[in-house]
Amino acid sequence: MIFGTPNSTFLENRLGSSTGMPFSSATSLNSGVDQMMNELNIQQPTSHTVLFDLSWEVAKKVGGIYTVLKTKAPVTVEEYKSRYALIGPYNASTAPTEFEPLIPGPLSSPIIENMMKKYGIHVHFGKWLVEGYPKVFLIDLHSSMHKLGEWRWDLMSGFEQAGDNETNETIVFGYQSALLLKEFAEANPNDKYIAHFHEWQASVGLILLKKWKVPVSTIFTTHATLLGRYLAAGGVDLYNQMQVLNMDFEASKRGIYHRHWIEKKSAADSHVFTTVSEITGYESEHILMRKPDVILPNGLKLDKFTALHEFQNLHAKYKGVLNEFVRGHFYGHYSDFDLDNTLYVFTAGRHEYFNKGVDMFLDSLAGLNKLLQQSGSKMTVVAFIIMPAATNNFNVESLKGHSYLKDMRRTCNTIVEAMGERLFEATSRGKMISPEELLSQEDLVMLKRRIFALKQKSSGPPVVTHNMINDNDEILQHIRRIKLFNSQEDRVKVIYHPEFLTSTNPLIPLDYTEFVRGCHLGIFPSYYEPFGMTPAECCASGCPSITSNLTGFANYMSRALQDTDSKGIFIVDRRFKSSRETVDQMTQYLWKFTQLDRRQRIELRNATEKLSELLDWRTLGKFYKTARALALERAFPPKPISRSPSPSPSSSLKLSTGLSNQIELQQQQQQQQPQPIGTTINLIPPSSNVSVTPTTTPTTTTTATTATTAPITTPKPNVIPINTGKENITLLSPNSMSSLLSDSLNEFKKQQQQQQQSKTPTTPTTTSTTTTTPSTTAAATNKSVLSNPTPTPSPNTSSFIPTNKGSTATTTTTTATPTPTPSNNTNGKPFNPIEALTKSNSSSNFATTSTASVNTNNGGTNSPVSKSIPIPSSKSLK
């Protein structure tokens, strides 16, 4: 796994640390990525590299992926220019404001025409109306809905859900996008294509590209696993039970196995699998059965947040708007509200009561209220909850209070203007005017009426600003349970605003970014948060925040900073502490924050705002570059190094796995300095697959066997052990690694000689025989049984329920064209830089024999159900 540097310790420690590998600044983070890319020697994009981003949210705002693609677009367009485009479904309702049609160029025009002529698929070409104006291909789903039944059966026959409209549209879009990419690859065979699929709704096309053997390198990013979100929302202790749950069975119980299968299969089939955080990577390891190759943290477009020296002035400006809201909401109910001793805290996001940690947020507010009351503090804390829920209108009491306040302000402005005229008239005549003459009787009457109206509020300050349709809303029920009703003696006031903020809001006329700048503290103790854009936006706005160690943002920042508290990022422990302990920890954070004076809060805001560079796409975009380069390396490996066979019998064996290349590489590096700590993980795995090829006849036979090397138990003087809490990670110097590789080579030669002497081949775990002729054609039969196969659904049931009885299905053998087979890292093995180097030197001109094996054993899964999906002909798709 790659995250800043290849040596990632967070997953090995199983989420137990809140202070990971330190980076002093964004500069060190960048240099770590650059150094890693240089060491891996992976391919960089050229003028013949074309990049596509595929998502359900291209030019259509649905969730957070829209923000990721939108803010990342300027940086990607700057890098790829016209060689970058996005692919998404066409939406007639959002297209007028998000999409501008363009005339296709000479490259795209024939492809779009072929899509209509061959398959009847209508593709809209144009530009996305966001900064950078990237080109987009929006595909009309309705033009292929008549093929839904055929495609659905072809993809997942036996366990499909015909009534799932979202999945039906996902399947149609998947086939359409795969056919579009296939047309590009066939029309321009000299170009190298990278297709980056975001989330399972867009990834059916990835599965099809793999089945059809289309020469396109693929990346799959899960921003949150589908089943993980279901389990967390259902109250399952996800991170403690993840290792014992049968994920396929859990998905079947919830009626989402067909969706889960798409996500799991996409992770297995992609050349590079990525997630947005290490916590999601740990989750994917158990739910999708594959560790991520690269971590891609979400970034922000900092131009939107940049304020430099003005950010404190902006805080004062937008805090003034919040002060105006507080006056209208609370004034008239009680008169001891001191705005100079008032702090504004908030939480925001989707209405997910448990996943977003709203329960702990409210419990900590109740604890803070007691502490402030017991200490006799004059500080008032106003806590906002900005989460959308079903409403039918604004609360009448809220509107009345703001209406009275606006009327009061207009009256005061009128009186002040009249007083100014009187004062000017008197002084211009050389007369002094008494205070009684400044304020007329009419003015006094008007003021008394306004004050009387303001005090005629029938009830206390409302907790909710709108009329809720669901009176049993979980947030409302919790507020009633802790009895925070905004009474006068409460030092903590709660404002539940069940609607996203806009500048046209009659109560709080601020955009969300402006609202964040006006607040003092953001609180996001989420239980399930793959990354967490809300605390990231707080950081970019100079607003300190509280988050949990189960969020991707906390993972990222704890690795980048040695002391997060001093930078305004407070991380509570939801992994190893009980709920009560976590609430107490958060209450203490809030209590300490209320004890800061104004100067200390300003210094904390300054420290937080300086971290924004860590979240800039120009910093985080390098992780995307790494993922793309790695995908190119696996999909299009370089040509092998040609070497002449030696006449000596003892040296006439060539290691086709690239082990000899490793030795040669290490010999070249012996004169160089040893590598620094943190550049290599598991250089010598416990087992290796080695192919030995005799060079005696023109026709060569390659036999793959499984050999095991002895584990390294005692480090040599030049071997540095690193304790990660899960396994030892050893960093080897070039001399020691060359020695170990030579020992491995001798061991393999010894085994080969023993096999030749006994003339009885040893039965390996998995044996495959490939005969290569000078014409590079091959025919072979390969039968294998997966150790942890994916449950095969019964064709007689619409909702698949895995069973505990195993039965092996028919094994299918197909002969592929001379195409390199990339390593997908589906066995959960961590990223190996040396392995990547040797793969880059392996031969790409050979015929392969592909074997698919399906076993219905419920003992676990290593890869999703493998189904043969033929390339549909143009005739069948018309």
Curated annotation (Swiss-Prot):
Question: Which GO terms of the cellular component aspect does the record hold?
Answer: cytoplasm
The Polar residues compositionally biased stretches are: 677-692
Q: Compositional bias (Low complexity) at which positions? A: 641-656, 666-676, 693-715, 746-781, 795-830, 838-878
Q: How does activity depend on pH?
A: Optimum pH is between 7.5 and 8.0.
KW Glycosyltransferase (keyword) present: yes
- Which InterPro entries does this one have? Glycogen_synth
The organism's superkingdom is given as Eukaryota
Write out the ranges of the annotated region (Disordered): 637-721, 746-878
Q: What keywords tag this UniProt record?
A: Glycogen biosynthesis, Glycosyltransferase, Transferase
The record's listing under CDD domains reads: GT3_GSY2-like
Q: In which pathway does it act?
A: Glycan biosynthesis; glycogen biosynthesis
The GO annotation for biological process reads: autophagosome assembly; glycogen biosynthetic process; sorocarp morphogenesis
What is catalysed by this protein? [(1->4)-alpha-D-glucosyl](n) + UDP-alpha-D-glucose = [(1->4)-alpha-D-glucosyl](n+1) + UDP + H(+)
Q: Is Nucleotide-binding there in the keyword field? A: no
Q: Which residues bind UDP-alpha-D-glucose?
A: K61
Which Gene3D superfamilies does this one have? Answer: 6.10.260.10, Glycogen Phosphorylase B (3.40.50.2000)
Q: What EC number(s) would the UniProt record show?
A: 2.4.1.11
Which Gene Ontology molecular function entries are recorded, alphabetically?
alpha-1,4-glucan glucosyltransferase (UDP-glucose donor) activity
Q: Which family does it belong to?
A: Belongs to the glycosyltransferase 3 family.
Q: What does this protein do?
A: Catalyzes the formation of apha-1,4 glycosidic bonds adding glucose residue from UDPG to the growing chain of glycogen.
- Can you say what this protein is called? Glycogen [starch] synthase
Organism of origin is: Dictyostelium discoideum
Q: Which gene encodes it?
A: glcS
